[in-house]
């Protein structure tokens, strides 16, 4: 917290012509958050800056060593090289200023080139990594001898290196060991994505260095119902009765989005305290009791058993096995948005997920039938909306896959039959989302109204291009913040799906069953531009979500 503020304080002290922050007479949001966390007994890490410096720094220190970096396809940026003496000096002063301003919980997060490629300044990337570890160790030893460095394993991409990868140069397990062994300051490796990547297994529990099991679960746009709960419990139990024997000294949860899937996150929180004591059946029962009240346990347990069988089961999506609603992406002829190496596993999963549809419908019906629960409990209403939107999404996915298959088979009649089904499902989804305030695009716009000159465009750019600033576009990050919001579905996803069907229809009529990437881009790019340029067009929001779900169930008898 307060990274930019502290950086400017340090540079102003160094005599650079930067505006030092003006002390606030009232507690800032950062102050209030830290105070609240400390009242709960939570230690808050200090996130050290990467070393990126303003133009004034390079004018003052023209001979300072630098690294030119690039993240995805965005403009390259420059940061101070960790081997330059100014790097250590800056980090020491940063920690001093931070502790004077906010105090210290003696935990420090610092990463080197995470997700970024080095374009200039380091021919040997591993050598630069080791220089970073040594500089951080020396700086923290001087600035806070009682602290602990918390490096994240997210940087340790252990897949085969691909020079065309826009993110970073990958690692070998030997390089990870050399990196950690170079540290002369206490550390705890934060093994981000333990529940799936499990790098602690591939590195022999980080070669004796203390580490923490860290659940990632989702990126910023993965906001559908997902998370294999049995696998999470299995991995936590596999650490044994005494996880410290394999160096595991912590268990944390670090999602990019925590506003969804509370069932999964509550389970992860319970595993943090005593993994071996957690039993899934007992957890489901307790979750229902705490969420809805003891009088509704018998009525709601079957709802969550169905969800554990489906969206929270073995065919659940992950950050790597992407089972998202397919309308969140540009549809093509593959309809596979995850890692290509997983295609053979994912294709049969899509087929099996057709079995989710009647079970999700039944879950919604059971929740509606639970006395007056949905009427009196806002969390139950939220759960009803989430189950219903997942039911709609699964039906859409199967219909779109069927339409793709019909096109590849040259079956124009089946393609024509499925088109209105897909588009109607998106109308149903937009209507449902508009009935729940948290799922309205206008709500996001209202939250940032004072932050951007054109908040509508900023929010739309964020959802399309992962960046609220116009002109900052990166193809690998397109639709990163994909999610179910009413106008996003009605004014962006639906027109894109309509363009998909129009293109396939024309191709099919001409007797062709192939479409190039360039042809898809030609019909999708105008949809994206039109959505970003259009004003906000709020949908009717006067319906009760319970009524909407009941209508949709009645109108779609299976």
PLM feature spans:
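Catalytic-core regions of glycoside hydrolase
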Residues: 1-297, 301-308, 313, 336, ...
